[in-house]
């Protein structure tokens, strides 16, 4: 009865007037997050499913827009001919932020299928990223017999709320500070591994002067980046514009892991799993004046964890 109720609203996908579902269906799931709940219905938009044959050659694709996906309760019937396939699933690539290579049936190999961030000619990106998701399934046999296969997604986008505050609560000038996040993660391969060789420079997609609830003046910059890997070269820099000096050059990934915190219901997880599950961070930096006129940042907070910075991270 539950199956009939579910699929009675999905005839627009099945084109089958029978109440009994048939065929191979893909259930889009996103439980690989810090809350350990399925958030596909609220976080995943469009889905692109790429099918490859047993020789890893491209066969066909299915693009499912957000409305269609959610009307179908994140269930998609796979329309490919009866055969065994390797499936590569990307979520969030329907716009112009992400680029796939030209796909040719029978020619394009799965290992050559990298997705790239559409940066400007300086390899910079200053917009809010569309949430990007990845999944892959091996040896999936399509048939007319009813079956449901789950595709568990990994989220590849990370968002940072960077707050700059004077330690004496003095006002700051927004134009005096420039934030930059750099990482060689602007190209991701079919295994969801960043393979870029040129650093992508992520600039704030929003930066403003603001007041905290205690009426303390701050500079609030919002940045984002693609997938972060343990041991990678992702850095966050803050430049003091009047002097031209970089006052912070932070190996970001290791500091995110210093503040690793997650609910007990997830169990013990690796550093990489934490980086993949967590997608939102608040970074607070406390400015300290100096006799040279160039401020310093000796202390920061990562998601409420206070960290004292080493001189090597304080720029030059």
Predicted feature locations:
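Intrinsic-disorder/low-complexity, polar/charged segments enriched in Ser/Thr/Lys/Arg/Asp/Glu/Gln
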Residues: 23-27, 73-75, 146-148, 159, ...
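Short consensus segments that form the blades of beta-propeller domains
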Residues: 37-42
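A sequence/structural signal for flexible, mid-protein segments enriched
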Residues: 119-216
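Hydrophilic extracytoplasmic domains
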Residues: 229-316
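Tryptophan-paired
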Residues: 48-101, 173-264, 316
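A short, Gly/Thr-enriched small/hydrophobic beta-strand-prone motif that recurs across taxa
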Residues: 16-35, 152-167
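Bacterial Sec-dependent N-terminal signal peptides
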Residues: 4-31, 308, 315
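Short, low-hydrophobicity acidic/polar segments
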Residues: 59-155
């Amino acid at each position: 009865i539950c199956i009939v109720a579910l699929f009675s609203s999905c005839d627009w996908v099945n084109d089958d007037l029978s109440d009994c579902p048939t065929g191979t269906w893909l259930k889009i799931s996103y439980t690989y997050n810090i809350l350990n709940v399925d958030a596909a219905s609220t976080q995943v938009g469009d889905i692109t499913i790429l099918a490859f044959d047993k020789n890893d050659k491209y066969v066909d694709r299915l693009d499912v827009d957000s409305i269609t996906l959610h009307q179908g309760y994140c269930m998609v019937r796979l329309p490919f001919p009866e055969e065994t396939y390797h499936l590569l699933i990307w979520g969030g690539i329907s716009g112009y932020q992400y680029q796939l290579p030209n796909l040719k049936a029978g020619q394009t190999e799965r290992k050559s299928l990298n997705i790239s961030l559409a940066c400007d000619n300086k390899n910079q990106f200053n917009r809010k990223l569309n949430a990007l998701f990845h999944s892959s399934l091996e040896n999936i046999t399509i048939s007319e017999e009813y079956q449901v296969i789950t595709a568990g997604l990994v989220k590849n986008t990370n968002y940072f709320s960077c707050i700059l505050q004077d330690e004496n609560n003095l006002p700051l000038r927004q134009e005096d500070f420039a934030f930059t996040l750099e990482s060689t993660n602007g190209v991701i391969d079919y295994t969801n591994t960043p393979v870029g060789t040129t650093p992508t420079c992520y600039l704030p997609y929003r930066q403003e002067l603001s007041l905290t609830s205690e009426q303390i003046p701050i500079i609030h910059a919002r940045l984002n980046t693609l997938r972060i890997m343990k041991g990678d070269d992702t850095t966050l820099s803050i430049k003091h514009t009047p002097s031209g000096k970089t006052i912070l050059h932070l190996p970001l990934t290791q500091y995110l892991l210093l503040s690793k915190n997650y609910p007990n219901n997830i169990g013990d997880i690796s550093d990489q799993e934490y980086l993949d599950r967590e997608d939102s961070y608040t970074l607070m930096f406390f400015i300290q004046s100096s006799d040279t006129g160039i401020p310093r940042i000796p202390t920061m907070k990562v998601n409420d964890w206070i960290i004292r910075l080493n001189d090597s991270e304080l720029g030059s």
